[in-house]
Amino acid sequence: MYAVGARVIACEPQELFARYLRATLPRDITVVHAAVGKEETTASMAVSSSHPTVSSLKPDFVVGASSAPGFGHVKWDTRESVTVTTLDRLIETHGVPSYVKIDVEGFELDVLGGLSQAIELISVEFLPGFPDLTLQVIDRLMDFGPYQFNPVMGETARFLWPQWRDGPAARAWLESLPSDSSSGDLFARLRHDS
C-alpha cells in the first residue's frame, strides 16, 4: 500500500519489534506501539521466543494451536504486558482508513469489537484449523453492512475467485476447507449498489 502512495499506520504491540519497525521503515509510516482490541487497556500477550511473530492475546488460540497444522513447533514460553488500543481510537486519531489488514493470531474478532463503523476494505488472516474464528469475523462484518468476500491463499497475492462472493458463500467455502489447507487472507469489501 505504501508503494502506491497510501498513508500507512502500523500497530505493533511488542516493544522490540516496534523499535525495529520505527528504525527501519520510512519515516512517514506511523508505527503505533500497541495491540488492537475491543477496548483500551493493557493485556498479557503470549510470546514464543523462537517464533515471536506468532504471539497472541487470545488464550484459547494459544491452547488450541499446539495441535493445529503449522503450529505444532510453536511454544508460547513467555508473556509480555502490552498496551491495547481500538480501531475506533485509531480512526479518531488518524482518520478513516481505506483498508485495514488484521493479522493477530486468533484475536481478529476482538479487534473488530473495537470498531463501530464499516471500513471499505478489510482483510483478516484465516487459518483452516480454526474456521470458527473466521466465521465469526464474517458474521461481524455482515453486521456492519453488505460485505463481499474473496480469499487469497498462502502468499499467492491473487484472489481465489474471479467474482467476489456474499457472506453465506464465503462461510460455506471456509467450512468446506480441510483443516490442513494453507492459511491465507480473507478480503472483505463493502458492496455499494449502483
Regions found by a protein language model. Name each.
Residues M1-S194:
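Phosphate/nucleotide-binding beta-alpha loop and adjacent structural elements of enzyme active sites
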